[in-house]
Structure formats: structure tokens, C-alpha cells
């Protein structure tokens, strides 16, 4: 008799996705981040659900409801900090996952890559709206500054901003709708993840060499289930270290002050995972130009597959491209640092140079490097 996992309509899907899936035999730890992102999403949805049971999305009580969660709810402090730092782990995994995709040429799976970009935008939007919910100073002013950027859109800008606000400033209507969107988006993300995996399983996984691995496949279970389990343990360990020893390490002290529309904080800045994009936004003196650069800093990922002119898929055997890739990583770290600095000399100049370098590497230098490497190999 055939095993039930191969015949049952529901179990069959699970079997083909997680058990009998043929996977390349040589994928490294860089391929762990997909499953780690899945774990992060589950952690965020579960902790978020329990937070929503005690949170009130009203300007008068939002801040105190978060305080109540931390002080009075059983293990409320743990749930709250798991959720806040879980977002940081989520973005660390996201950036590693995207970096892996760029390094090993996984972006040639166009559908998977493009849905990944949509997922990135969705997660960023969710994180932004979640940051507004505690209704601290940085929540309020962050929401004001970022939503205000839409007013740079010609003709309809101002109307659009007031429509999003639900009034003439960030207020109760804004907070309530942000809570509603913050609650629903993770489930939309979960659905998109299914589509992401559907397209990935059409082609199968890429591998470090970038060479098709059809002749050498191994079953997902037990090889990659045990490997993913190890990744889960490492991620949970790091998350717990953060939550239990320094839960406020990555947060902003200003957010422990209740929102006050009459008092602007000296330095308005987003969470660390948005600082690179914020630095790019600030490096352009023009409002509309800055907004376009901000959007392009992520949307540029969609252009990468069309700039792939190398005869090799992966960067594994391409030293010039490798150097450029790591310069890009260093550049993003520089932008992250600049995003958290005040707008003054020399930070302005460093930010502008780093922003130009960011787009130059992706749009000009990497394709050039590929050309040179092709020439060297007489291809």
C-alpha cells in the first residue's frame, strides 16, 4: 500500500514541498535563510496576535496599553520584545537572503525573484506601520515624515497624504487604519510566500556553483530538514540573547516618550533596518528626487536580472564581481551608519558619495565586471 503522504490530497502538497522534494546536494548555509524567514513570519504572527489581544489602537490609550502589556500581562514583556526584536531578525534574514540571491545569480528565476521583491516591499510596509503603533515620539514623527513624502507626488500629492492620514495630520484615524493594515498584511505576506515557493519549485533551487544540479539531487528530508532545524536553533538563540539581555539595544529611547505633536525630537530616524534607504532619501536635496531614489533603492533589484551579461550564473568563480559585491555590502553598511547621523558636514557628503556608489555598482560596475570576466575567459 502506498504511503498516505503520497496519496492524501493535502499531505501530498506537504510531501512534495518538504519531504520528497529533490534538492541540490551542495547548497550551503546561505540557503537556510528562506526557511528562517518562514520561522520569523510565524514568530511575528503569533507574538503579534497575542499583543493585539491587549493593545488598543486609540491615540489616548495606545501608549499606555503597550506599557500595560509590559507591566501587567503575564509574560507580556517577553511577547512585546520578541515581536520588536523578531522584526530585526526578520530583516537580517531578509537582507542575507537577497544578498545570497545576488551573489549566486538566483535572480535568473524571474518570477520567484519578482515576487520576492514584492514580499520585501510588503514586509517593509508592515514594519513601518508596526513602528507607529506604540504611539511614542518616534512613532508619531516617523509616521508624519514618511507619509509626508507622498506629498512630493505632483498634483495629487497633498490630497493623497490627507486621504492616508484620514484628516489634516497624523491622528486617531491614522493610528486605527495602520493597526488594521499591520494586522492583515502578514497574512497577505504568508499567501505571497506560498506563491514564491510555488514558482521556486517549478525550477528547483539554485546552488553555489550556478550549474544545473539535475544529475545530483538528494531528498529534502532528512538532509535539509535537519539543516533547517539547526538554523532555527541558531536564530532562536540569537533572538533570545537579544530579547533577554538587551531588548532595547536596537530601539530608540525617544519612543519611550508618549507622542507629542507640539514637540519635535532633535533627530527623527527610522529603525536600523531602514537607515540605508533613509540615507539615500536624505542625500538628494530635492523632495521628489529623494522619494524616487528611495523607491529605486529597492526597485533596482528588479533591474538586476536584465543586467546579467556574464556567461556564468554564480559569482563563485568571478573574482572581480566578488570584490564589487563586497564593496556593495560595505557601502550599504556605510549608508546604514549615515542614516542614523545628523544632517551635517561631513555626513552629508559621505551619504551622497555612498548613494552614488550604491547605484553605480549595481547599474554600471557589475555589468562592466561581467564583460571583463567574459573577455578574460575568451567567451
Swiss-Prot record:
Heme 1 (or BL or b562) is low-potential and absorbs at about 562 nm, and heme 2 (or BH or b566) is high-potential and absorbs at about 566 nm. The cytochrome bc1 complex contains 11 subunits: 3 respiratory subunits (MT-CYB, CYC1 and UQCRFS1), 2 core proteins (UQCRC1 and UQCRC2) and 6 low-molecular weight proteins (UQCRH/QCR6, UQCRB/QCR7, UQCRQ/QCR8, UQCR10/QCR9, UQCR11/QCR10 and a cleavage product of UQCRFS1). This cytochrome bc1 complex then forms a dimer. GO terms for molecular function: metal ion binding; ubiquinol-cytochrome-c reductase activity. Keywords: Electron transport, Heme, Iron, Membrane, Metal-binding, Mitochondrion, Mitochondrion inner membrane, Respiratory chain, Transmembrane, Transmembrane helix, Transport, Ubiquinone. It comes from the Eukaryota. Pfam families: Cytochrom_B_C, Cytochrome_B. The chain crosses the membrane at residues 33-53, 77-98, 113-133, 178-198, 226-246, 288-308, 320-340, 347-367. GO terms for biological process: mitochondrial electron transport, ubiquinol to cytochrome c. Heme b b566 binds at residues 97, 196. Heme b b562 binds at residues 83, 182. GO terms for cellular component: mitochondrial inner membrane; respiratory chain complex III. Its cofactor is heme b. PANTHER family: CYTOCHROME B (PTHR19271:SF16). This is Cytochrome b. Component of the ubiquinol-cytochrome c reductase complex (complex III or cytochrome b-c1 complex) that is part of the mitochondrial respiratory chain. The b-c1 complex mediates electron transfer from ubiquinol to cytochrome c. Contributes to the generation of a proton gradient across the mitochondrial membrane that is then used for ATP synthesis. The gene is MT-CYB. A ubiquinone binds at residue 201. It comes from Sylvilagus obscurus (Appalachian cottontail). The keyword Oxidoreductase does not apply. It is found in: Mitochondrion inner membrane. It is a multi-pass membrane protein. Binds 2 heme b groups non-covalently. Belongs to the cytochrome b family.
Amino acid at each position: 500500500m502506498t504511503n498516505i503522504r503520497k496519496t492524501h490530497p493535502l499531505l501530498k502538497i506537504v510531501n512534495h514541498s518538504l519531504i520528497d522534494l529533490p534538492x541540490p546536494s551542495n547548497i550551503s548555509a546561505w540557503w537556510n535563510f528562506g526557511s528562517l524567514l518562514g520561522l520569523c513570519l510565524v514568530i511575528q504572527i503569533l507574538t503579534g496576535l497575542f499583543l493585539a489581544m491587549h493593545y488598543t489602537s486609540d491615540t489616548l490609550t495606545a501608549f499606555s496599553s503597550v506599557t500595560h502589556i509590559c507591566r501587567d500581562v503575564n509574560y507580556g514583556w517577553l511577547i512585546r520584545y520578541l515581536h520588536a526584536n523578531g522584526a530585526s531578525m526578520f530583516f537580517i534574514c531578509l537582507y542575507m537572503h537577497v544578498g545570497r540571491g545576488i551573489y549566486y545569480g538566483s535572480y535568473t528565476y524571474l518570477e520567484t525573484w519578482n515576487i520576492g521583491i514584492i514580499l520585501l516591499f510588503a514586509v517593509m510596509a508592515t514594519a513601518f506601520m508596526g513602528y507607529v503603533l506604540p504611539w511614542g515620539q518616534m512613532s508619531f514623527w516617523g509616521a508624519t515624515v514618511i507619509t509626508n513624502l507622498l506629498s512630493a507626488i505632483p498634483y495629487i500629492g497633498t490630497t493623497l497624504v490627507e486621504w492616508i492620514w484620514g484628516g489634516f495630520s497624523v491622528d486617531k484615524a491614522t493610528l486605527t487604519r495602520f493597526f488594521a493594515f499591520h494586522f492583515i498584511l502578514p497574512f497577505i505576506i504568508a499567501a505571497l510566500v506560498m506563491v514564491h515557493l510555488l514558482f521556486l519549485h517549478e525550477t528547483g533551487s539554485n546552488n553555489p556553483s550556478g550549474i544545473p544540479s539535475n544529475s545530483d539531487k538528494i531528498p529534502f528530508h532528512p538532509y535539509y530538514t535537519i539543516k533547517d532545524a539547526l538554523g532555527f536553533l541558531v536564530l532562536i538563540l540569537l533572538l533570545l540573547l537579544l530579547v533577554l539581555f538587551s531588548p532595547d539595544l536596537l530601539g530608540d529611547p525617544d519612543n519611550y516618550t508618549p507622542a507629542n505633536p507640539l514637540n519635535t525630537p532633535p533627530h527623527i530616524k527610522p529603525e536600523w533596518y531602514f537607515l540605508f534607504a533613509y540615507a539615500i532619501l536624505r542625500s538628494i536635496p530635492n523632495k521628489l528626487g529623494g522619494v524616487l531614489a528611495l523607491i529605486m533603492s529597492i526597485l533596482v533589484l528588479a533591474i538586476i536580472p536584465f543586467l546579467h551579461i556574464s556567461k556564468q550564473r554564480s559569482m563563485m568563480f568571478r573574482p572581480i564581481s566578488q570584490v564589487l559585491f563586497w564593496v556593495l555590502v560595505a557601502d550599504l553598511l556605510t549608508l546604514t551608519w549615515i542614516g542614523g547621523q545628523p544632517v551635517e558636514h561631513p555626513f552629508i557628503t559621505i551619504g551622497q558619495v555612498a548613494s552614488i556608489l550604491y547605484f553605480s555598482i549595481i547599474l554600471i560596475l557589475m555589468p562592466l565586471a561581467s564583460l571583463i570576466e567574459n573577455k578574460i575567459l575568451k567567451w
